[in-house]
């Protein structure tokens, strides 16, 4: 069987939050590979860590949260080099990745998508912003 490099790989990811001096272990040792073109749904009960885990891919954890163990790697960068997302700390580094390389639509579409615009218009708007394209080229 042929093996390919995933576009996104998480290995033994642990995420903790500091809550008034106490440590909350929100995620304990998750492994995940997503292949190019693959669609993945992460499901679970409310409070099970779905949003925390996926926010960690984008550097969107709350200020009191951190990846304390493990790695998250992105292998789809335009220049072919892997990006170790779990090591990015500065907002300026995330700005090079977020929207340009990876993006996400949060689970509540009413707060993520504008009901007055088509989805195509909203995707084109993101492309215009990040890729500096206009009109049809963005669509």
Describe every region a protein language model picked out.
Residues 1-139:
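ABC transporter nucleotide-binding domains
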């Amino acid at each position: 069987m042929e093996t390919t490099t995933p576009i996104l790989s998480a290995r033994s990811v642990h995420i903790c939050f500091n809550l008034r001096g106490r440590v909350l272990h929100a995620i304990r040792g998750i492994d995940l590979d997503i292949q190019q073109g693959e669609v993945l749904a992460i499901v679970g009960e409310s409070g099970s860590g779905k949003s925390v885990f996926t926010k960690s891919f984008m550097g969107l954890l709350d200020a009191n949260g951190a990846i304390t163990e493990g790695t998250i790697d992105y292998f789809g960068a335009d220049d072919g080099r892997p990006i170790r997302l779990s090591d990015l700390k500065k907002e300026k580094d995330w700005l090079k990745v977020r929207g340009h390389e990876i993006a996400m639509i949060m689970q509540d579409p009413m707060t993520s998508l504008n009901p007055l615009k088509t989805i195509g218009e909203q995707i084109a708007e993101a492309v215009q912003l990040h890729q500096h394209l206009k009109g049809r080229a963005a669509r």
